[in-house]
């Protein structure tokens, strides 16, 4: 009987735990965004070799954020990072065409974009950095009506502006069940 009340109490007041991937091409700002979320400040970063994992707590949510390296030898392994993932974030510069020409085909070739193990759809939040107003360019790339995608959103951001990062975290926690 005590277990029932404990589960009920945790479900009502407990923290929501989510695993989030940050995937993109080289030097797109993945590590900068991760540490801006974790520490609240920009730190000098070097290219990620392999992956980096940090736990970020925001309001009533706990995010295990995975910054996955994007060297061409690592990209085929991206599919393995999607297990038990509640969503993905993809920073990139659409000015350089990285989202359209690099990241989207890579992800689509390894998993149904927006689909993870078990056929469940999850939120995907592409971020567009270094080019103001470029989020509109993603509207022509990403299918709005595909039931396989689940909810998705796009935010133009710079890792130097924490309000954009926190609004994306709030969006993620709102759409993830």
Swiss-Prot record:
Its main location: Golgi. The gene is ARL17A. GTP-binding protein that functions as an allosteric activator of the cholera toxin catalytic subunit, an ADP-ribosyltransferase. Involved in protein trafficking; may modulate vesicle budding and uncoating within the Golgi apparatus. It comes from Homo sapiens (Human). A lipid is attached at residue 2 (N-myristoyl glycine). This is ADP-ribosylation factor-like protein 17. SMART domains: ARF (SM00177). GO terms for biological process: intracellular protein transport; vesicle-mediated transport. GTP binds at residues 24-31, 67-71, 125-128. The keyword Glycosyltransferase does not apply. GO terms for cellular component: cytoplasm; Golgi apparatus; plasma membrane. The lineage of its organism: Eukaryota, Metazoa, Chordata, Craniata, Vertebrata. It is found in: Golgi apparatus. The keyword Protein transport applies. Belongs to the small GTPase superfamily. Arf family. InterPro entries: ARL17_C (IPR031687), P-loop_NTPase (IPR027417), Small_GTPase_ARF (IPR024156), Small_GTPase_ARF/SAR (IPR006689). Gene3D superfamilies: P-loop containing nucleotide triphosphate hydrolases (3.40.50.300). Keywords: ER-Golgi transport, Golgi apparatus, GTP-binding, Lipoprotein, Myristate, Nucleotide-binding, Protein transport, Transport. GO terms for molecular function: GTP binding; GTPase activity.
């Amino acid at each position: 009987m005590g277990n029932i009340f404990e589960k009920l109490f945790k479900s009502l007041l407990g923290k929501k735990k989510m695993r989030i991937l940050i995937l993109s091409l080289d030097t797109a700002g993945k590590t900068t965004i991760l540490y801006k979320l974790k520490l609240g400040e920009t730190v000098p970063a070097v290219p990620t070799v392999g992956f980096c994992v940090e736990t970020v707590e925001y309001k009533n949510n706990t995010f295990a954020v995975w910054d996955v390296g994007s060297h061409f030898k690592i990209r085929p392994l991206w599919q393995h990072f999607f297990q038990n993932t509640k969503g993905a974030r993809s920073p990139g510069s659409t000015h350089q065409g990285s989202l359209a020409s690099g990241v989207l085909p890579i992800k689509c070739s390894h998993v149904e974009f927006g689909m993870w193990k078990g056929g469940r759809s999850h939120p995907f939040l592409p971020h567009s950095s270094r080019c103001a107003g470029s989020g509109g360019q993603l509207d022509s790339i990403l299918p709005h009506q595909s039931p396989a995608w689940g909810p998705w959103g796009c935010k133009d951001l710079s890792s130097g502006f924490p309000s954009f990062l926190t609004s994306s975290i709030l969006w993620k926690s709102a759409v993830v069940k």
